[in-house]
Amino acid sequence: MDMSEKKQIRRNSRKKNIFFTYQIELAGSLIGIFLTVGLLAVILLIIFFSLENSSTTSPLPWQYLYSDKSEDMIKDAEGNIVPGKKEGPITLTFAGDILFDTHYAAGERIASAGIQNVIDPSLIQEMQAADVAILNNEFPYAEGGSPTPGKRFTFHASPESAENYRQIGVNLVTLANNHIFDYGEAGLKCTLEALNNAGISHIGAGNNLSEAADAYHFFSNECKISILSATDVEAGDHPDTRGATDTLSGVFRTVEDSYLLQRVREEKEKGFFVIVIMHWGTESTSQLNWMQEKQAPEIAAAGAGLILGAHPHVLQKIEFVGETPVFYSLGNFYFNSKKADTGMVKAVIDHNALQSVQFIPAIQSNLFTSRADEGEASRIFSYLNRMSGSATLQDDGTLKHR
């Protein structure tokens, strides 16, 4: 073999080595690309299924019942949202006034600390475990605008703060009160939108009287429950809080209560267990006013099976009107920095009958609402029992005829 042939062989060998090396590098690059694409695909699949699951089975802080105004959804044993109707009795909790306005101490503390850190965890658990948890939304959600001229106290909160309710298990709020119109028609409109956007149901105010006087309905296989919200405060001819009419937005105003009684009778005739939540009474006193004493028997006679009240900012007496329990005022649930007794009513309804009613005593103090300990609970029960002629609270808060 001459030198030229040997050189040609070496050149061919180098070409083969270069080609082989190139093939290895190319294969390595392709493998790297495939691995990267595969990893990205896995990540995308994980994100996709996470989003899908969060939108369909992520547990909310409450159990949905079937309602004519909400999805036909309940939770399964694991807390996932599944289609269907709730079996068995319905549990409801009721508490008094709450305020999200950050210009006041209570609202500022909620904004800075988080609502779950200003209310006793055991009280939050009661609301989250209930099928329906209700508070009085004592303010409008409003951005911009002007408060009612000449009104001493006016409130408003950011629309985003309506999401607070979801964190503590509240799924229905009452709007028939003397502050929901503090920022006028625009403020009320913003309030309805904010609550709707947050998925929080509401009663007692609307774009017209039909909406304001509309009941909220909850159904299980054994129960049909109707809840109404109304107010009789600001009894003068020119109230700061506008009553809704056929053409004007406002609250369900019942200083003259014939339409409220009609609505109770209508709901009762449809086969509902009717609950009425009133904004009534005189502020800062445990004494009932004449309108409370007049209206409670009328509402009960019209067919209400349970009546609860707010507005006085303090606890008032409990009584039975016939077989209808009346909690005249539940006080402030989380409203200001003052120390005050308060509480929560827990009602269980089965086969359209009230199975049990329990008062859970609590104390609002230093911008925290705590469940009362045994000693404080005994004191609050004794205080209420002294005022309440026909009703008595037992040691566990269960309400009984005296």
Residue ranges and their predicted role:
Residues 1-23:
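N-terminal targeting leaders characterized by basic, low-complexity, disordered sequences
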Residues 2-7, 28-402:
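Acidic, metal/ion-coordinating pockets
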